[in-house]
């Protein structure tokens, strides 16, 4: 990397970091890391969600700018001097120029997927993103794992030959269906426990077995 490139990248990172000056050093490190996977290990109330929200803000504003070694085509010595001497209280035009110089392939809000475990946590995440003032925050996919997958399936499952108008069954629904099938086949629930039947079906799904493959597997097992 040339002296110009290394200085430009250092100045760019410093300018971006100023947007997150209120965070502590470890939080800021997580926010500014954009390349590759990142694991945050911290206790309750230590600011993990704060890091996540600020990291999304960084990605949407600056893309990979804080963590890459690329210099924009046409970057000049004047641009470098501007970043290295970026004022403490910039004007709106200066701030706009800084963001243009520092941004590297920022994604659109709808390209960001923020997955959490509960509906309550997903709702809080969406509310905090909107309160943060991120443009287009409503388009960010801040969802639970299940709701994210359902949204994808509703949109694209027809490409696999299935209907988009499907119904999701919970555990009780599944047990009821298995019980109905056992009754229809005149099989004793004490011998074929619905819970055990569901466990076998779940294992087959994990192994990506089709109903036909599953039938062949058990037909040859002797059980």
Where are these regions (language model features)?
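P-loop NTPase Walker
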Residues: 1-163, 168
């Amino acid at each position: 990397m040339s002296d110009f490139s290394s200085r430009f990248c250092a100045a760019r990172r410093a300018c971006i970091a100023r947007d997150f000056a209120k965070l502590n050093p470890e939080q800021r490190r997580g926010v500014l890391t954009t390349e590759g996977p990142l694991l945050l290990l911290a206790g309750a109330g230590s600011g993990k969600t704060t890091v996540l929200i600020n990291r999304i803000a960084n990605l949407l504003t600056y893309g990979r700018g804080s963590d890459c070694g690329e210099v924009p085509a046409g970057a000049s010595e004047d641009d470098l001097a501007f970043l290295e001497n970026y004022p403490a209280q910039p004007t709106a035009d200066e701030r706009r120029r800084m963001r243009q110089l520092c941004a590297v392939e920022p994604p659109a809000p709808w390209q960001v997927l923020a997955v959490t475990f509960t509906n309550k946590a997903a709702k809080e995440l969406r509310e905090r993103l909107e309160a943060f003032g991120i443009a287009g925050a409503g388009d960010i996919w801040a969802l639970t794992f299940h709701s994210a997958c359902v949204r994808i399936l509703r949109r694209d499952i027809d490409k696999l030959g299935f209907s988009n108008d499907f119904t999701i069954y919970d555990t009780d629904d599944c047990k009821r269906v298995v019980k109905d099938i056992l009754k229809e086949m005149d099989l004793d629930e004490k011998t074929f426990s619905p819970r055990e039947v569901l466990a076998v079906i779940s294992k087959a799904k994990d192994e990506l077995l089709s109903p036909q493959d599953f039938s062949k597997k058990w037909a040859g097992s002797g059980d």
